[in-house]
UniProtKB/Swiss-Prot annotation:
Keywords: Ribonucleoprotein, Ribosomal protein, RNA-binding, rRNA-binding, tRNA-binding. One of the primary rRNA binding proteins, it binds directly to 16S rRNA where it nucleates assembly of the head domain of the 30S subunit. Is located at the subunit interface close to the decoding center, probably blocks exit of the E-site tRNA. GO terms for cellular component: ribonucleoprotein complex; ribosome. The lineage of its organism: Bacteria, Bacillati, Actinomycetota, Actinomycetes, Mycobacteriales. Belongs to the universal ribosomal protein uS7 family. GO terms for molecular function: rRNA binding; tRNA binding. Part of the 30S ribosomal subunit. Contacts proteins S9 and S11. This is Small ribosomal subunit protein uS7.
Length: 9
């Protein structure tokens, strides 16, 4: 399932 929060850089 998709994670919540900003995409990791």
């Amino acid at each position: 399932m998709p994670r919540k929060g900003p995409a990791p850089k």
